Amino acid sequence: DCGYDPVTKELYARDNVGAAPPEQVNDAGWIRWRANDLNRFLKRLSQRLKAIDWRVLITNAPVQFPFSYVNFAQEYPAWVREGSVDFISPQIYWSTSAQYERELGLQMSRLEDVTRL
């Protein structure tokens, strides 16, 4: 249910001919709009930080994809692909090493460049 604050609702209306955000939090268009907005923000932030000091490393520890996308609009494969982050460290928590290795493999399959994981 992230994104229903007044500022985000105003930004959504601006981008959508005055329309209010969908009431259904799982609306595909709403999730896509929020993810695009977050992707643009992270790209701008990354560029500004790198302009100040190119040596700074931009990292993030999102929850697993696609859960991160559906629930928090965190599309971390796009962040890696677009160069908005230098590397990511997905939050993967399992009680057995087999479960962990399986989930890590799934997360790696989401990335074109696994060296940034």
Residue ranges and their predicted role:
Residues 55-59, 86-89, 116-117:
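Structural preference for beta-strand elements that scaffold enzyme active sites
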Residues 1-82, 94:
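Polysaccharide-binding and catalytic clefts of secreted carbohydrate-active enzymes
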